[in-house]
Regions:
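Active-site rim helix/loop that mediates acceptor-substrate recognition in acyltransferases
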Residues: 18-42, 49-54, 151-183
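Conserved beta-strand in the GNAT
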Residues: 48-56, 63, 68, 183-195
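A short, internal acetyl-CoA/4′-phosphopantetheine-binding micro-motif in the GNAT/acyltransferase core
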Residues: 67-75, 202-211
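Conserved acetyl-CoA pyrophosphate-binding loop and the N-cap/start of the following alpha-helix
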Residues: 73, 77-85, 211-218
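Conserved active-site alpha-helix within GNAT-family acetyltransferase domains
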Residues: 80, 104-122
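Conserved GNAT acetyl-CoA-binding A-motif
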Residues: 90-105, 220
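Amide-forming acyltransferase catalytic core, primarily the GNAT-like/NAT-type
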Residues: 116-196
Length: 220
């Protein structure tokens, strides 16, 4: 048994147990190449590959994603060992925080995270929106924003801790917008989905239904 970095030659073996993870399938085949390029795509091998996870290291935080275990080898702490391996690398590089995004109905992953002393940090709602032509909206681009008020934003499904530089860069690219009506303000931070073309991921901070509607109209 060993944990090593995955290579392009491992893809076929991994995809055999990454097809029906969710009701709609899985996304691992779409991100495989980009995760290989980023590095830190860890593979648990027991004669054959039986588990993977990817780690994204950014400043003092670790983002652990894409944990997949062959169903024939579950309940053997393979996922826990992969996560611990990713954490150790982070600790050696002065990481202070480790995060995972887990569906609230994924009881097995929640149990695994709890067993490793992870705690629920925040609970978010996810909605999807299809494009629609609309030129009637009341929004403005934000030129400055406080990272204490908006401490995180989503980029390629990673909850990234904001910094002054990140927010300035996003503002320069017109990726922070707000709507202010009747003293209520909603703000949206637009992130890219690097692994899927023509897809945006938007972090919304809603102040009222009316201002949220204006932002959604613009995003469409």
């Amino acid at each position: 048994m060993e944990i090593r970095n995955a290579t392009s030659f491992d893809k076929n073996s991994i995809m055999k147990f990454c097809k029906h993870t969710f009701s709609w399938g899985d996304y691992i085949d779409k991100v495989w190449s980009s995760w290989l390029e980023e590095g830190n795509l860890f593979l648990f091998e027991q004669e054959l590959p039986i588990g993977i996870c990817h780690a994204f290291y950014f400043e003092n935080q670790i983002w652990i994603e894409g944990i997949r275990i062959d169903p024939n080898f579950r309940r053997q702490m393979v996922a826990s060992k992969l996560v611990t391996h990713a954490e150790l690398i982070g600790k050696n590089n002065n990481a202070s925080f480790s995060y995972m995004l887990i569906d609230t109905e994924n009881k097995n992953s929640i149990y695994m995270a709890n067993s490793l002393n992870y705690e629920i940090f925040q609970t978010w709602n996810y909605y999807s929106l299809i494009p629609k032509k609309n030129s009637n909206f009341k929004i403005e681009f934000v030129k400055s924003i406080d990272s204490d008020v908006f401490p995180f934003y989503v980029d390629s499904w990673r909850w990234i801790k904001t910094t002054k530089k990140i927010l300035v860069d996003l503002s320069t690219q017109n990726k922070i917008i707000k709507s202010n009506l009747n003293g209520k303000t909603s703000v949206a931070i637009i992130g890219d989905y690097k692994h899927l073309a023509k897809t945006l991921i938007v972090t919304l901070f809603s102040g009222s239904f009316e201002t949220l509607f204006e932002i959604l109209s613009y995003l469409q």
